[in-house]
């Protein structure tokens, strides 16, 4: 029985370590620009909907109500599909881990002439006594109590990938309101 517990702990910890190493490699490659980027015309609304579908059960488990506002479809942008998926996934994962349970999560998709502005907004479960710039640094986490798993690389990776796709990522913290704006 004890041996089984130890093996389970070892398995979980080795999986965490593997994920950390993968994130470190991706963060390094993304920040130095040594990642292959293949820009193509994509429907951001469709991809966001697919990523949101992957988080549906997790959000329900945390009693998070996802509201996606998109008045126009399709919303065509120039992006690399793999990297855009990772950006959306990182942001949704952050929301799932750090949002106040029982609150609403808003995602607004606003088409513009040659791209789109996509805004993610949620209320943090804990006060964010940290600047927006600090949150985007590697290994920095808004949850200083370390109650959740994570490497503190997600936002840094997302920002680097956005730059590689000729986009921008702006992060705003206002009290416990967390807002990320992606612009393509």
Model region roles, listed by residue range:
Residues 12-17:
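Short alpha-helical segment of the dimerization/phosphotransfer core of two-component systems
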Residues 32-37, 76-79:
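Conserved micro-motifs of the catalytic ATP-binding
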Residues 38-56:
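A conserved beta-strand-to-alpha-helix junction within the catalytic ATP-binding
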Residues 38-42, 60, 65-75:
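Conserved catalytic submotifs in the C-terminal HATPase_c
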Residues 95-96:
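Short helix-loop "hinge" at the ATP-lid/N-box region of the Bergerat-fold HATPase_c
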Residues 127-140:
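Short conserved segment of the HATPase_c
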